[in-house]
């Protein structure tokens, strides 16, 4: 019988290594094909389904590991329980625990009798604070149970400065039991401590959820006597679903976070200071309106909403800049609250009659104008340009009659004329030419040696055309012939002169 042979068989858990694989969800290093239980008769998969192949592989693997034909149900269950206990991670030394399992003869009862708390890791305790009540809890305890225990402690004792820290009596057996019950949910949870801010909702109901806030990311900023908390990134967590290390704090109440400051005296002496701090004041007002969503909904009649508007317009002489007075921007999430608060503040009475604000006669505000030399700067663009063209002083160049608006532009332009004159003037005979090429051709005359020389008589010429005409003398060539008298000429100029003088009537 399998039950009689079971005590003599070792489960050999130390030879089984759990490794993940892409081809199957679980794979053991032990050779499955050599096991007699692995030779099972499966009908061949005609469609080649991957799910069917995966199930067949898992079937063979678990049969090879548990060996149901050799072991009883209790032995297989004991082996699964031991493997699950090792995977949870509560044991300190897995190798020592496996040796104890082998020493007990693979009997779960004997194995549990030999166990002590020395093989377990000490539980990690987390300091939790909620509405004045503080206690230490195990990291594996559910969040819902933590809140329940803190509520019981709060109802039993009222928080005082003397008993502010009261540890809850939680034994290790209870902590370990709680951790094993929630081990399935705790395998993927991190061990980073977070700070939870538990507050009442705007409707005044009991706590429905916890606001989990990272402690490192949300510092508190103080300004005077008003404390602002900026939740840059907050998320809601349901009760009993989170088992991270948490630290609860009570939400700020109207008594803890004052929303009103003492009214300031906006007298003539303080007007200049208000001008300089106009931007900072409006920025603080928007921040305080943003925080009004986390407080039970009341009438927001704070002075911080009013003081962002009534600052005199900065002026320069008698010309205002035209800067709008209200430059406060509120975030999207608080636009409704801002509209309600502004409607309540300004619909019933004049804001200038609020206490602490000195009432002044309303001065007429002129229309904003551009800061130009005179008030004609508001004219349309075309007329504006015409006026400047009409009033501008023009400077005329005497050489080319060009007009310039500035004297420095005229002087710069006249230098170009001087440069051109120096380029067009012959240095030897002071003769002026229209083009630079003509000046260069003329300068050849003043050279001691002409560049073009006759090869027959070695006479030199300044131009190539003159040299060609001279060479015709030596060759006797006369290319130009008169059609009327058949007379020949060497040069075209002589030919045309002959036509004008002798054949004009013809």
Swiss-Prot record:
Keywords for the protein's UniProt record, in alphabetical order: Chromosome, DNA-binding, Metal-binding, Nucleus, Repeat, Telomere, Transcription, Transcription regulation, Zinc, Zinc-finger
Q: Which GO terms describe its biological process?
A: telomere maintenance via telomere lengthening
Annotated GO CC locations: chromosome, telomeric region; nucleoplasm
Kindly report the protein's main subcellular placement as a broad class: nucleus
Q: Where are the zinc fingers (C2H2-type)?
A: 395-417, 424-446, 452-474, 480-503
Start and end residues of each SCAN box domain: 37-119
Q: Where is this region: Disordered?
A: 238-264
Describe, from its UniProt entry, the tissues in which this protein is expressed.
Highly expressed at the 2-cell stage but its expression is rapidly turned off.
Which Gene3D superfamilies does the entry link to?
Classic Zinc Finger (3.30.160.60), DNA breaking-rejoining enzymes (1.10.4020.10)
Where in or outside the cell it occurs: the entry states: Nucleus; Chromosome, Telomere
> Could you tell me one molecular function GO term of this UniProt entry?
DNA binding
Give the protein's biological function.
Answer: Transcription factor required to regulate early development. Binds telomeres and plays a key role in genomic stability by regulating telomere elongation. Acts as an activator of spontaneous telomere sister chromatid exchange (T-SCE) and telomere elongation.
For this entry, the protein name equals: Zinc finger and SCAN domain containing protein 4D
């Amino acid at each position: 019988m399998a039950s009689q042979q079971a005590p003599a068989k070792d489960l050999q858990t130390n030879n089984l290594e759990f490794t993940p694989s892409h081809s199957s969800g679980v794979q053991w290093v032990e050779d499955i094909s050599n096991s007699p239980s692995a030779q099972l008769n499966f009908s061949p998969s005609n469609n080649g389904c991957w799910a069917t192949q995966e199930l067949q592989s898992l079937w063979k693997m678990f049969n090879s590991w548990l060996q149901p034909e050799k072991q009883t149900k209790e032995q297989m269950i004991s082996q699964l329980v031991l493997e699950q206990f090792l995977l949870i991670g509560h044991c300190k030394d897995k190798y020592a625990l496996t040796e104890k399992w082998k020493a007990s003869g693979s009997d779960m009862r004997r194995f549990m009798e030999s166990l002590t708390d020395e093989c377990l890791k000490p539980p990690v305790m987390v300091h939790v604070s909620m509405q004045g009540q503080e206690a230490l809890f195990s990291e594996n305890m559910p969040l819902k149970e933590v809140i329940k225990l803190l509520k019981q402690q709060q109802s039993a004792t009222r928080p005082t400065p003397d008993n502010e820290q009261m540890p809850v009596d939680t034994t290790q057996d209870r902590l370990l039991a709680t951790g094993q019950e929630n081990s399935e949910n705790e395998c993927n949870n991190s061990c980073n401590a977070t700070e939870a801010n538990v507050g009442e909702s705007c409707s005044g109901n009991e706590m429905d959820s916890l606001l989990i806030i990272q402690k490192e990311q949300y510092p508190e900023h103080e300004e005077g006597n008003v404390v602002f908390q900026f939740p840059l990134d907050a998320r809601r967590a349901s009760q009993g679903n989170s088992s991270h290390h948490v630290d609860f704090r009570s939400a700020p109440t109207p008594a803890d976070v004052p929303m009103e400051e003492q009214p300031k005296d906006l007298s003539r002496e303080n007007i200049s200071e208000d001008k300089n701090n106009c931007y900072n004041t409006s920025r603080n007002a928007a921040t305080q309106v943003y925080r009004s969503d986390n407080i039970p909904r009341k009438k927001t009649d704070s002075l911080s909403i009013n003081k962002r508007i009534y600052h005199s317009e900065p002026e320069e002489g008698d010309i205002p800049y035209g800067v709008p007075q209200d430059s406060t921007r509120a975030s999207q999430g608080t636009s409704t609250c801002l509209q309600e608060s502004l409607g309540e503040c300004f619909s019933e009475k004049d804001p200038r009659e609020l206490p602490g604000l000195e009432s002044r006669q309303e001065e007429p505000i002129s229309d904003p104008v551009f800061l130009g030399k005179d008030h004609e700067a508001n004219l349309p663009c075309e007329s504006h340009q015409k006026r400047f063209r009409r009033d501008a002083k023009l400077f005329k160049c005497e050489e080319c009659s060009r007009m310039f608006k500035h004297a420095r532009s005229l002087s710069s332009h006249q230098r170009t004329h001087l440069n051109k004159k120096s380029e067009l003037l012959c240095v030897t005979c002071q003769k002026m030419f229209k083009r630079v090429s003509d000046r260069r051709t003329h300068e050849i005359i003043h050279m001691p040696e002409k560049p073009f020389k006759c090869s027959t008589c070695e006479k030199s010429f300044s131009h190539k055309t003159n040299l060609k005409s001279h060479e015709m003398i030596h060759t006797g060539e006369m290319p130009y012939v008169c059609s009327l008298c058949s007379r020949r000429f060497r040069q075209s100029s002589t030919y045309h002169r002959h036509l004008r003088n002798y054949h004009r009537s013809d």
